[in-house]
Amino acid sequence: MSNFAIILAAGKGTRMKSDLPKVLHKVAGISMLEHVFRSVGAIQPEKTVTVVGHKAELVEEVLAGQTEFVTQSEQLGTGHAVMMTEPILEGLSGHTLVIAGDTPLITGESLKNLIDFHINHKNVATILTAETDNPFGYGRIVRNDNAEVLRIVEQKDATDFEKQIKEINTGTYVFDNERLFEALKNINTNNAQGEYYITDVIGIFRETGEKVGAYTLKDFDESLGVNDRVALATAESVMRRRINHKHMVNGVSFVNPEATYIDIDVEIAPEVQIEANVTLKGQTKIGAETVLTNGTYVVDSTIGAGAVITNSMIEESSVADGVTVGPYAHIRPNSSLGAQVHIGNFVEVKGSSIGENTKAGHLTYIGNCEVGSNVNFGAGTITVNYDGKNKYKTVIGDNVFVGSNSTIIAPVELGDNSLVGAGSTITKDVPADAIAIGRGRQINKDEYATRLPHHPKNQ
């Protein structure tokens, strides 16, 4: 039989105090909805239907082409949300997972175990439950002496005895698809909230003598639903611990994993060393034996093997094997650094390609440049790429030596093996093998300093 999935993502999330739909708030680099969608993929659903509502167009954009969408125009409860999927799923034979889009910590393994449990026990409905020492606020799972599920009782309706139950409802379910939609026709809004509750179908199944079961999570953290910023921060913390643990198991060393922030899609090879306060975001990839020191921040970039990045920022760029960057360097988007390049302290590279073995040790700006191999930039070199309206390119060949405190005004080309004298302002192309000196001639005026106030004779 087929598996189907319904993801509930229509809520506004008032307690988040945000215009952004709740399910689009991010945990470890991707939205909560994407986390749930990826986990749902473990059951290989034939159809996945996402129920949208508040700012539906934003939610649909995130999963465009990956799921079908239905709209819940009025927020009339979880049962009502599932009813919205009827045109797509009613009458199909199979098992349907119903899950909230604000549960980013649920794993694909747990959802696979849930649906296998449901099938193996021939249940018409299976509730995903968890156990906690502090069940206050959760619906409790009431079982009979044979451990069969009798009902779900909410906190406000629970007796003193039922309040002692530690097994709680996580809000995730698997149903026989055909029976689900039959039962939904019989639920009503006769409750304090005036809403259709998906939990009411459990009572209907019990009344008709059908089998209802419960599968209990091994890890309570997976049950966390995010309703406010506090819970969002908790989810972030749990997810990052998982991510860091996975990398450590795979051979990555962390000085302080509690102070290291790695997004879920980051790839890290073995033998990488990561110091505290390192942030790796987006689609970043780190090669083997690379060292990332305290304070390094990398976004959507690829760093090769054996690199050393010291307290620097790298954005949307590629860094080859053996490169050293920093401290306090900034590699801005669309840059590429060849093998063994050295970018030192207080150097900024923007939109430039730099050939292997090139060095810019300190206090340099390289913007919109094509730089060859074995180039040396002296301290204080500036490539001037912007005239206030347009940006221009500088081309620097192989084996070029640029003296300290030089200004290279684009568009200009420095040929292979050329040399720029220190303190020069270069406005014209420099041929290969040439020396360019673009500064005023030094003039010494003997004894002139004796006329000035600073001179000891005038004190």
Swiss-Prot record:
Catalytic reactions of this protein: alpha-D-glucosamine 1-phosphate + acetyl-CoA = N-acetyl-alpha-D-glucosamine 1-phosphate + CoA + H(+); N-acetyl-alpha-D-glucosamine 1-phosphate + UTP + H(+) = UDP-N-acetyl-alpha-D-glucosamine + diphosphate
Annotated binding of UDP-N-acetyl-alpha-D-glucosamine, by residue: 8-11, 22, 72, 77-78, 139, 154, 169, 227, 332, 350, 365, 376
Top EC category: transferase
CDD domains hit by this protein: GT2_GlmU_N_bac, LbH_GlmU_C
This protein's pathway: Nucleotide-sugar biosynthesis; UDP-N-acetyl-alpha-D-glucosamine biosynthesis; N-acetyl-alpha-D-glucosamine 1-phosphate from alpha-D-glucosamine 6-phosphate (route II): step 2/2; Nucleotide-sugar biosynthesis; UDP-N-acetyl-alpha-D-glucosamine biosynthesis; UDP-N-acetyl-alpha-D-glucosamine from N-acetyl-alpha-D-glucosamine 1-phosphate: step 1/1; Bacterial outer membrane biogenesis; LPS lipid A biosynthesis
UniProt-annotated stretches for the region Linker: 230-250
Residue sites binding Mg(2+) per the record: 102, 227
GO terms (BP aspect): cell morphogenesis; cell wall organization; lipid A biosynthetic process; peptidoglycan biosynthetic process; regulation of cell shape; UDP-N-acetylglucosamine biosynthetic process
Family (UniProt): In the N-terminal section; belongs to the N-acetylglucosamine-1-phosphate uridyltransferase family. In the C-terminal section; belongs to the transferase hexapeptide repeat family.
Stated name of the protein: Bifunctional protein GlmU
Organism of this sequence: Streptococcus pneumoniae (strain Hungary19A-6)
Encoding gene per record: glmU
